[in-house]
């Protein structure tokens, strides 16, 4: 693991419940009623995983747009409907063409993770 403590401090990040660190950067002023109660209709966060960290597998209850801006690439595993992924999840590799090797230039830099996956 690299020492990302200076970056965490500089960006004002806090531990995220699913692993890594984050900071909420925007919250919509409108609310929607959900089975889990009233929630903001949208929000945005900065999310940081160190090189050797993984986010805990979890079911997302709302659509999530992941935008990758780090060096190298990030694998996002999709598929499953509960506490564990499917046996053969769909893997999408996100990578910034400007910051990865030429062979990675075809990788997208964002993905929509649909609610319920």
Where are these regions (language model features)?
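Non-catalytic, conserved peripheral segments adjacent to functional cores
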Residues: 1-111
